[in-house]
Amino acid sequence: MAVREKIGIVVSNKMQKTVVVAVENRVAHPKYGKIVVKTKKFKAHDEENRCQEGDLVRITETRPLSRTKRWQVAEILREVKKL
């Protein structure tokens, strides 16, 4: 079975070794045809605590690590600049 991947933005890194990643999905409304942006949040494992809020990351599906965590951060695609 292929490994599922998603790309999203880190919206929270307040937990130890865990980040919340918001993934946008654009779908057409079935009746009206308007493109609607749907956002879903995934908890992902970040072993080294490298991710900051605003980073663009790729997450991959993994075995369940906790009750709500089934994804892990594969790589950071774009880091946010720190002031």
From Swiss-Prot:
GO terms for biological process: translation. Gene3D superfamilies: Nucleic acid-binding proteins. CDD domains: Ribosomal_uS17. The keyword Transferase does not apply. Keywords: Ribonucleoprotein, Ribosomal protein, RNA-binding, rRNA-binding. Pfam families: Ribosomal_S17 (PF00366). GO terms for molecular function: rRNA binding; structural constituent of ribosome. InterPro entries: NA-bd_OB-fold (IPR012340), Ribosomal_uS17 (IPR000266), Ribosomal_uS17_bact/chlr (IPR019984), Ribosomal_uS17_CS (IPR019979). SUPFAM superfamilies: Nucleic acid-binding proteins. One of its GO terms (cellular component) is cytosolic small ribosomal subunit. Belongs to the universal ribosomal protein uS17 family. Part of the 30S ribosomal subunit. PANTHER family: 40S RIBOSOMAL PROTEIN S11 FAMILY MEMBER, SMALL RIBOSOMAL SUBUNIT PROTEIN US17M. One of the primary rRNA binding proteins, it binds specifically to the 5'-end of 16S ribosomal RNA. This is Small ribosomal subunit protein uS17. The gene is rpsQ.
